Amino acid sequence: MYFARVLAAAALLVALPAAADFNDKKPINATVTGATPSGYPRTMVEGMNAVVRDTYPGSAVSFKPNSPGGGVLEIAEGRADFTATATGTEVRLANEGQSPYSKPLKGKFSYVMQLYDNQFIHFLMTKEWADANGIKSWADIASKKPRMRLAINRPDNPQTTIGAPYEVMKAYGFSINDIEKWGGSYVLGNSSIGLDAIVDDKADVFMNARNLGDALVKDVASKRPLLWIDGDRATIQKAADAFNFKADMVPVGTYPFMEKEYPTVRQWVALLAGSHVPDEVVYKYVKAMAENEKRVQAIGGSLKTSFTAAKMAVNPANLPYHPGALRYYKEKGLVK
């Protein structure tokens, strides 16, 4: 009987397929989306794709322009494999089918890696407008309801609208819709469009993401004096919690007009994959990034100051890992 059980167990082991070995140099094919046709996000994606192509010669890893919000839809519906600009905003809204998504996408995409966690939302106002309306803080805006021309992104770019400014407004007792009720208006577009509007006196307030110490913000401030909208860190944290972000303080001197620390929303940005993407493709993309840390950092921007292999498995939204990514992280002890 004992020998029969041993033989049966051995036969079962033979029958089970062994896990494929992905530790080879065979090429992979993938399309990465989520970045606009120009600017840093595209530079980031093109740089990461180049690392993968060099690690696995012959790979066809390409870039497909889109937006952060649109990128998640693309991978969920199988029109692209990865999106490289997702945050907690896109993850939650897509899972739940909230605007700008028309239906829940839960289960159609999964987590691959954190790319960086230092995307800071800039809450700026012109000194001229602030002085004219007696505004120093979010609380002042809530109580005085001033007419403002607000430069902000479009709501179909959720992370820099729904994911931060809208939530901070809610935390202080008003909403994005109140801006028009107070006699104000919007300049909708990316951060470059918004800063141009400040320079051209077409906007009074700017809410969007830029790197800390951004040269363009400094240049704008030299032409039209700026101030940071002050606030209470605990209240900002309440807003940040909605999408698994955190409140952080912008250090004194980050910009010439900052005489003290100011609170803001600090966001993380992640690479996601569609559920249709083979484990091998995801595993190899992850491995290429992890084992070429210095080269990834050399792409510049947020990757230079925040990307590390040790933090790739950090998953603030607790989105299920793609099996290919999870396999690599378990092999390296980054996930239990």
Language-model-derived ranges and their functions:
Residues 102-122, 254-263:
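A structural signal for short loop-to-beta-strand junctions that line the ligand-binding cleft
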Residues 15-17:
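N-terminal signal peptide c-region/cleavage motif recognized by signal peptidases
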Residues 44-51, 62-106, 192-198, 206, ...:
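Pocket-flanking alpha-helical
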Residues 1-7:
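Bacterial N-terminal signal peptides that target proteins for export
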Residues 200, 205, 210-222, 228, ...:
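An extracytoplasmic/periplasmic, membrane-proximal ligand-sensing/linker region
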Residues 226-284, 320-321, 328, 332:
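C-terminal lobe and pocket-closing loops
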